Design a protein with these regions (language model features):
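Formylglycine-dependent sulfatase
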Residues: 1-6, 11-232
Length: 232
């Protein structure tokens, strides 16, 4: 499951009339999958606590059934089918949301909130042909978020790193990141050629770079200090 959260906090300590707002987006999670909405097989106490102390909707609809389009709809308030590019994006796609567009982040900023986006993004970054070793712009900070800590692409795509306010977190400049979605890097393991390194068997499309024992989409080398650890 890939999670992302959008958070908005009042800028002023004295602004007690404004509640904190947290929006959690989860891939492949049905409304009936949490116990707050009736699931009796799986217990989700933390989500239930939020539901009990927040607002529950009983008639909600997603603008799309897939990742990028639904996130685009939530971010902009626009139907994703109105934008031909609002489809599942590759890991090195440029920022899908125009920096001039009004977004949910900008809405909260205009209302006096500090804003943050954390986790899976999947709305693209930069202007294409991303250099992961430099400042990446435009990204989330350009469309309404004061702070961002984002998965660079998706959990199954390279590079498997976090991007904090436009820069890869914990990156050693002496070990730069290289990413290619077409050609493997010599000497770097892949799911096809190195099955002994794979903890989870690959499926078609997910058979490229092996990172943390998991075969990914695309090829990557370098950036060892910045690679996330699924266990932590």
């Amino acid at each position: 499951m890939a999670l992302a959260s959008l958070a908005a906090m009042p800028m002023s300590v004295g602004a007690t009339e404004k509640p904190n707002v947290i929006i959690i987006i989860a891939d492949d999670l049905g409304w009936g999958d949490v116990s707050a909405y009736g699931n009796r097989t799986v217990s989700t106490p933390n989500i239930d606590f939020l539901a009990q102390n927040g607002a529950c909707f009983t008639n909600g609809h997603a603008s799309s059934a897939t990742s990028t389009p639904s996130r685009y709809g939530l971010m902009t308030g626009m139907y994703p089918w109105r934008n031909d590019d609002a489809k599942i994006l590759p890991g090195d796609a440029p920022l899908l949301v125009d920096t001039d567009q009004f977004t949910i982040g900008k809405m909260f900023q205009h209302a006096g909130y500090s804003t943050a986006a954390i986790g899976k993004w999947h709305l693209g970054m930069g202007e294409g042909k991303i250099d992961w070793n430099r400042q990446i712009t435009p990204a989330g900070n350009a469309i309404g978020f004061d702070y961002t800590y984002l998965i660079a692409a998706t959990v199954d795509r390279v590079p498997t790193v976090y991007v904090e306010n436009g820069r890869v977190a914990n990156l050693d400049p002496n070990d730069p990141i290289s990413v290619d979605y077409e050609h493997p890097f010599e000497g770097e393991p892949t799911g096809v050629n190195n099955p002994e390194l794979v903890k989870m068997h690959w499926s078609h499309g997910h058979q490229n770079a092996v990172i943390n024992g998991i075969p990914r989409i695309g090829f990557m080398k370098g950036g060892k200090s910045a690679i996330w650890n699924e266990k932590t």
